[in-house]
Amino acid sequence: MHTDEMWQLYFPNGEPIPGVGWDSARDNPEEKDSEIVGVAVVFVFRKTKENGLELLWQKRSAGVSRFPGFYDISAGGHINLGESLIEAAVREAREEIGAVISPEDLSFVTVRGFNKNRFAWIYAVDWTDRVDEFRFDDEEVEEVKWVPFEMTHEFKEKYAKPSLKKDNLTFEALKIWFETHGYL
């Protein structure tokens, strides 16, 4: 995360508050129920003959301030002021893991609320027929790792950052999305 970013704020109905952002260098706006912070989340997945469905995880570098050395979702972060949800998802995938994706590559999975005023718009990207050329900023991401989807629960319990260890709803929604779209 860059400390000079302005995060887009939203009304409780999900509409962006025009021209209103939260300075990310300040404390988080968790005390204001009327302002919601948006997060774009991207799960990169692929199907292989060996392991079936796999999810891509990123390991956070030792030098980051939040959750160093823990594994995290493929990519994700706050939506910048004036940025659309799709633009944020594309940007975060590029910035965090060097994945060059287009808006058409993103498939909407679900929206999840967490904390009292944070909402994550969750997308999936099929990487099945692509070459693994992930280039990432070593200061933020140490490595990326493909993990069989059937091992998700065990993997996140052992290696994921604390907030993901207890987040079963997101992964259940992802599983349902995979099932309804013929990946599982």
Pin down the residues of each PLM region:
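Nudix hydrolase/Nudix homology domain
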Residues: 1, 18, 69-71, 81, ...
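Acidic, metal-coordinating catalytic segment for phosphate/diphosphate chemistry
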Residues: 1-50
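Residues that flank catalytic or metal-binding motifs in active/ligand-binding sites
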Residues: 5, 38-40, 75, 119-121, ...
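Surface-exposed, flexible loop/turn segments at secondary-structure boundaries
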Residues: 15, 50, 63, 114, ...
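Conserved Nudix-box catalytic region and its N-terminal flanking loop in Nudix hydrolases
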Residues: 22-39, 51-91, 95
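Histidine- and/or cysteine-centered catalytic micro-motif in compact active-site loops
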Residues: 47, 60-62, 76, 111, ...
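A short coil-to-beta-strand element that immediately follows conserved catalytic motifs
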Residues: 100-109
